[in-house]
Amino acid sequence: MNKESLFESINKLSDYECINPYSSVVDLEYNETESYWKSGNIQELYSISRSGRGETDHQKVPFCGGIIIFQKQALEKLSGWNEEFWGWGAEDDFQSIKVRNFLNHLQVKDKCYHLWHIRGNIDRDLYFRNLHLYNHYINMQKEGLSEHIEKTKDLVGDFDKIKKMVK
């Protein structure tokens, strides 16, 4: 992403509680990533003109996926990130729902460049568990989400929170 755009986004935190400094993700290919690592020339990335995820296809980029900037008190207002999600999947989607419902937020029109890397194996059982949990939360009304946030606020920073959440 363009560093000037990132700094502009950070400077807008006085007006917004949460900012996503990009709206699409360009997934770099192996050779593009390797070339960037060798040259260190960020302009090479900026010269890539293809569309990113979410621009011309059905893929969505979660508001809270990847780079996300919060005011500290805004993150506290949301009770942080929901730690009921384990492994990979859906935690950023749920955080996005909380942001859209409870915070003054901004999504900047810019591209983010995702370096190519080997993808790890996803634990499908945990992934489907996360989807089940996510479906539970997306079916809540705003009042139910608010109650959930209030209920979990005292668990932020508590190392024994998982034990308390399953009781």
What are these regions (language model features)?
Residues N2-E83:
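Conserved catalytic core of nucleotide-sugar-dependent glycosyltransferases
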Residues T56-D57, P62-F63, K72-Q73, K77, ...:
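C-terminal catalytic/acceptor-binding lobe
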